Amino acid sequence: MNIIVNGGSRGIGKEVVLYLAQDINNHIIVTGRNKKALNRLSSSCANVHTVSVDLSVLNKQSETFKKKILNHFKRVDVLINIAGILVAKEFMKIEDDEARLMMETNFFGPASVIRIVQPLMQDGAHIVNISSMGGYQGSEKFKGLSHYSASKAAIACLSECLAEEFRNSGISVNCLALGAVQTEMLEEAFPGYKAPVNAKEIARFISYFALEGHKFINGKIIPVAVNNP
């Protein structure tokens, strides 16, 4: 199985890579901004390859990114878009560049990755986009997460649309809207907050869903939370 984990240098993405890499039949490309963290991953797992990329400027580096992917894979079976950034500020206090960075990283970057990778996918392939309960319609909302939630709502809606656009190609697209998970990103945004689920636990669920979920589900936004957010 050829798998790309977009955003795997730390947190949930890293745990997904480590879990999937336990199966030697899985060959994984992991992308991220932190080159040192990526190198540590590839050094510890023989079936993991790394591609350093800044999603906020991927539109300017798309050809370079595609060449790096093609150096390892001619076919992609699974794409998991986990990359994300969170700036916890209320709507009237957030700076324009902070808001744009979240939208570039959480929406436009993953969308660009899909556009680059999709031609390498065949019938039976699966794209899994990771969203948030903050971007899940009808869920409880929280102060300081307006732009973050909007960016996650965007990737969720895109998932529904792409499932229809890619249907004739046999490529499934689903979205997991995660509740709070204990990660570095959460701790940095909300010091002292304790989530009910840790990164390793949710990584096992994401990995299983990425490999098997498309056999039963397509074009769905699935809430994965024991509480809100």
Model region roles, listed by residue range:
Residues I24-R40:
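Conserved glycine-rich Rossmann-like NAD(P)H-binding loop of the short-chain dehydrogenase/reductase
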Residues C45-N59:
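Rossmann-fold cofactor-recognition segment
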Residues I82-V87:
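Conserved NAD(P)H cofactor-binding loop of Rossmann-fold oxidoreductase domains
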Residues E90-F91, E98-R100:
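Substrate-binding pocket helix/loop in short-chain dehydrogenase/reductase
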Residues V128-A154, S159-E160, E164-R167:
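Catalytic loop of short-chain dehydrogenase/reductase
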Residues N168, C175-L176, P191-P229:
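C-terminal helical subdomain
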